[in-house]
């Protein structure tokens, strides 16, 4: 039996590399193994580490293993990726524990119930082991066949004893689409003699790479917003099992050493209990022992942190769970030269295997401490009173998505039944949600609502803030109110309200509702005559009487001498059934404002959008836009690689979107002609805005830091030969070299929320109920407003920082700077957007800016 495991471990090597791994590289002592348990290559025909395994191979082997072993059962499909790949998890424990699995699962809810009578000593700890949320960090997922095999086949008494005290939830891959994308790449770019040169094509993936999911999102940043099916499934799994420890297996730069938690202490989230970090350190002692025994170097307490509460290793910290991050140096393929020597894929797998076993040992040894911590987290904290209130005037769809996110975190949400005035705002019953602070998940609710401006350290691994009501641009209370009256929320639609009324005049659609854009595209595609109101008005309707309508209201009317076609009426009826309010007009005459026959209703046409992708572009930025158009607007998008753009006839499109500069010969002239002929260019990001200005497509001027001003002044003095102005006066003061990194970090903007002032009469501002707009900022470049008084629809306020870190100098530069500028060029326009309006797919508050640019681009020409 020893030979079986030796063969398995040796199979981790390839060719000449096999000799670098022996049985003792993974296990110091090899127990007898159950011969009835199939080894990986017996099922898939592929040895672990021989090449990168695909999703279906891992699932096939683990399912076979579960059939063969009494220590392993499948928990079923908890999600399906956009690419159609199922995500399956498995429970691994002693046969006795698995026989009582439903009982132990039910007890998980009792552990966090202060009124439950549960003997903790009789409960096993739950360990959630998650691998490869980044698909091209593949050693984690590729380790799971080996981990599961050893747990199923071992006769080691110590490990069997550990399984009596631990239920393992094995989540073998969190990102199957990215995993397969990377497996396809690396397996297709290696021969029988793999290259260890870091410059080799195998080690430098094309864009998009395997890190991201189907729509090119980082799924490890999707725990908080859970916009994608993989995240929603794993979130449900997490709350179903309420683990005591959650493991998050990653890879990092090839020249690093292995990392495990704890992270940098100064960057721990202030809501994380101290005991959490103590337990993290205790668990770390078991990893240290395992890695020291093999002479494997590692590091802790630097580089990575526990601040952003939306990653796999930090999210659990606010639910009574201990989150642990592992970072293995990556071979990014079969083998790669590093400063530490030749790093092979098998070595990476063996370290993930080793960390898996040390985690099981630690969880079993600390079972009582972990269970007590989890119970105390929920039963001993001080309970707060009151409710947070939030509303989205005129946009129930946006509010419903906000509620969905909260409920995904098991946060209770209720409906306000009586109007409340608080913090200078009136919150109306029937339109406002109320979130009670007195609930089990109050801690995570607090981090979602929290606004933070003061920080112990100003260096961040990820973003510095994530205030959810600002992401949705909701009218909300910053503090809890105690005078709210509430009831359970209802999600049903009144049958009478779901029936489309008849009108010979036409139908009005409130553009404020986030469900309206998808309907608009369908209407235009169906050939409907759709117009948009460029001024507010009050109209008479057949179903609701007199109704006030704002900028951007859609008017679906019959064409001359025709009635509205039945396919168009069917689209309207279906939208009404799904909850979107459709108002049949009773008359073209309006009591106030423009009449329905006014020339202030502009005719809309079907947009045809091209987005620049591929070499040189950002997968994140383009993926966010692709997801918005494809999944939310339900409209097609043409994606063209940057190196092919010059060969595309842009006359076939109404819009070109780029999130990166396109510095290729002839492209600027091509785009200039496109814009002058009526096209719209959406240029997103500071470097893209600068490129558009440099290319002569737009005008943008920048605000300068004090250092930039000094540099410019020095250059001017040198050019003029001004001897009276000495360099000593203009050069920066001398500073210690060791402070350079921190000084640079202070200048960065790593995810802050700024308060913008929005012109809601501008076509890009149509559908907003308020001029206040919260924008997510990730760049430290600041743009001046346009010298055209009508062309800066978003300008930041004079004190714009709502939450997050931003240096004093950057705050000064941000004040009254522009977030969005429109440049007219011929019949078309260039829209300059410094910020991502669709950040991580959950910044619903600002995504409408891009949507408006797509549908209302023809309205951007300044009226004469």
PLM regions with names:
Residues 148, 165-188, 193-194:
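Carboxylate/His-rich catalytic cores and anion/metal-binding grooves
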Residues 173-175, 186, 249-257, 687:
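Short, solvent-exposed turn/loop segments enriched in Gly/Ser/Thr/Pro and often Arg
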Residues 199-217:
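Aromatic- and acidic-residue-enriched carbohydrate-binding clefts of CAZyme catalytic domains
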């Amino acid at each position: 039996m020893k030979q079986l495991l030796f063969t398995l471990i040796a199979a981790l090597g390839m060719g000449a590399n096999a000799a670098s791994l022996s049985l003792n590289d993974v296990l110091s002592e090899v127990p007898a193994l159950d011969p009835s348990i199939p080894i990986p290559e017996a099922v898939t025909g592929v040895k672990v580490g021989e090449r990168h395994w695909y999703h279906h191979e891992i699932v096939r082997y683990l399912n076979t293993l579960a059939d063969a072993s009494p220590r392993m059962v499948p928990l079923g499909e908890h999600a399906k990726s956009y690419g159609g790949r199922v995500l399956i998890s498995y429970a691994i424990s002693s046969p006795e524990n698995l026989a009582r699995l439903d009982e132990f699962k039910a007890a998980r809810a009792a552990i966090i119930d202060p009124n439950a009578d549960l003997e903790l000593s009789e409960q096993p700890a739950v360990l959630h082991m998650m691998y490869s949320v980044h698909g091209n960090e593949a050693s984690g997922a590729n380790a799971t066949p080996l981990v599961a095999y050893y747990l199923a086949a071992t006769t080691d008494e110590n490990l069997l004893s550990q399984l009596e005290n631990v239920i393992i939830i094995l989540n073998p891959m969190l990102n199957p689409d990215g995993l397969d994308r990377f497996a396809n790449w690396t397996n297709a770019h290696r021969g029988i003699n793999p290259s260890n040169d870091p410059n080799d094509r195998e080690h430098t993936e094309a864009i998009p790479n395997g890190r991201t999911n189907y729509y090119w999102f980082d799924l490890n940043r999707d725990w908080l917003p859970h916009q994608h099916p993989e995240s929603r499934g794993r979130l449900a799994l997490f709350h179903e099992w309420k683990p005591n420890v959650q493991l998050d297996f990653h890879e990092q730069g090839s020249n690093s050493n292995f990392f495990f938690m704890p992270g940098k202490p100064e960057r721990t989230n202030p809501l994380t209990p101290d005991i959490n970090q103590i337990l993290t350190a205790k668990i770390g002692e078991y990893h240290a022992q395992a890695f020291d025994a093999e002479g494997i170097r590692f590091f802790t307490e630097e580089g990575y942190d526990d601040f952003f509460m939306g990653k796999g290793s930090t999210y659990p910290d606010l639910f009574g769970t201990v989150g642990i991050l592992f970072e293995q140096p990556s071979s990014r393929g079969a083998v790669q030269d590093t400063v530490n020597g030749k790093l092979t894929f098998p070595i990476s797998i063996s370290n993930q295997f080793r960390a898996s076993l040390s985690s099981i040992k630690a969880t079993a040894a600390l079972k009582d401490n972990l269970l007590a911590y989890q119970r105390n987290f929920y039963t001993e904290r001080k309970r707060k009173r009151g409710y947070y209130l939030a509303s989205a005037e005129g946009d129930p769809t946006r509010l419903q998505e906000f509620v969905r996110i909260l409920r995904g975190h098991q946060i209770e949400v209720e409906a306000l039944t009586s109007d409340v005035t608080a913090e200078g705002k009136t919150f109306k019953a029937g339109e406002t949600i109320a979130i009670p602070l007195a609930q089990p998940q109050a801690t995570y609710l607090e981090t979602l609502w929290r606004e933070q401006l003061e920080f112990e350290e100003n260096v961040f691994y990820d973003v510095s803030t994530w205030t959810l009501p600002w992401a949705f641009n909701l009218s909300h209370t910053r503090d809890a109110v105690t005078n709210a009256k509430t009831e359970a929320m209802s999600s049903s639609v009144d049958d009478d309200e779901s029936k489309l009324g008849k009108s010979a005049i036409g139908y009005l659609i409130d553009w404020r509702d986030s469900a309206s854009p998808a309907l608009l595209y369908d209407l235009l595609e169906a050939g409907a005559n759709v117009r948009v109101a460029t001024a507010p008005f009050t109209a008479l309707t057949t179903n609701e009487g007199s109704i006030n309508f704002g900028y951007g209201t859609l008017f679906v009317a019959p064409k001359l001498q025709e009635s509205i076609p039945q396919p168009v009426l069917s689209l309207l009826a279906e939208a009404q059934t799904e909850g979107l309010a459709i108002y049949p007009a009773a008359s073209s005459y309006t009591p106030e404002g423009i009449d329905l026959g006014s020339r202030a209703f502009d005719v809309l046409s079907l947009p045809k959008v091209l987005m620049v992708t591929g070499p040189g572009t950002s997968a994140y930025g383009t993926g966010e836009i692709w997801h918005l158009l494809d999944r939310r607007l339900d409209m097609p998008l043409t994606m063209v690689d940057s190196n092919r753009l010059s060969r595309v006839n842009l006359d076939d499109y109404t819009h070109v979107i780029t999130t990166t500069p396109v510095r290729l010969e002839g492209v600027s002239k091509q785009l200039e002609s496109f814009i002058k002929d009526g096209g719209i260019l959406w240029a997103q990001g500071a470097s893209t805005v600068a490129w558009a200005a440099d290319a002569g497509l737009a005008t943008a001027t920048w605000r300068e830091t004090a250092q930039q001003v000094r540099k410019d002044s020095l250059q001017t003095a040198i050019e003029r030969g001004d001897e009276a102005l000495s360099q000593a006066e203009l050069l920066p003061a001398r500073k210690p070299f060791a402070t350079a990194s921190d000084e640079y970090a202070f200048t960065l903007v790593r995810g802050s929320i700024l308060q913008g002032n929005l012109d809601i009469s501008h076509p890009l501002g149509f559908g907003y109920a308020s001029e206040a707009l919260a924008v997510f900022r990730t760049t430290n470049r600041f743009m001046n407003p346009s010298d055209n008084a009508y062309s800066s629809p978003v300008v930041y306020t004079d004190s714009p920082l709502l939450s997050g870190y931003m240096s004093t100098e950057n705050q000064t530069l941000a004040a009254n700077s522009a977030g969005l500028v429109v440049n007219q060029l011929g019949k078309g326009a260039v829209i300059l957007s410094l910020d991502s309006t669709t950040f991580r797919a959950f910044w619903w508050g600002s995504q409408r800016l891009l949507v408006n640019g797509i549908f209302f681009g023809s309205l951007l020409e300044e009226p004469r």
